[in-house]
Amino acid sequence: MTLYQKYETDNAYNYLQQIIDLLEEPICLLGGWAVFFTVNELYKKETGSDYLGSKDIDLGFHIDMNFKEQQLKNTTMGKTISLLEKNGFQSQGSRYYKDISIENGRELTSEESKNEPAHNVFKMYIDLMVDNVHPSFRKIFNFDPLDEDLLNLVFEKTTMRTEITTFKKLLWIPAPEILLSTKIKSLPNRTEDKRIKDICDIYAISFFSNKKVTELMKESKILLEKDRFEKLKPFLESDDDFLTAAEHLLVDGESIKNLFKELIKT
């Protein structure tokens, strides 16, 4: 049983390499691929398999609230948007995408995509997220950005990020406690496949990163308001999601449920 189809994660990984090659260092990587690079070494040592990949690419950007409009255009965010557009990615708000043929992996033009059966088209998404929403952002870039205030810590404090060299580029990856906190925040609003992936990620970060689970839980409770953990309580009403996540993680479903019980404790 697979969470995502192999062509989805393979395509995303290939495009991740291409995008990283285009961008200026350091590159802040978020989401599922950030979790992958955080946990994969220990996870593979424990299970013999690579950790779950992602079907999307998530990138983070610092926005200085004091920037003038021209400075905003010249930020890493602005340069990234220009590069994506020059390389054929289409805008869908804060998401950029390409349509890919599932049959042969070929990039499709807009016209070709319209003429293809929907089941033969995979949308390769790149999500752009900022730490601060500049008042002129929409005027300059014509969309409202996704924002995450915890990203401020990643850009401000070296202790809140892990710096790795991958694909010959310097990547900044949020520290495990930041990744865990963002997953806890996003989980209650997720639809099925994303929900299961977030549960997997919460467990993997807790047990396969370079920090002890007790330390991570303590730090996440400093970073997040109490109500964020309260919103996890409905997940304890059924074992279904935990059992599904356990199949993907190659672990016991009860251990995932027990982790959630500990997270919910005040």
Question: Language-model segments: what does each one mean?
Answer:
Residues 1-266:
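Compositionally biased terminal segments of proteins
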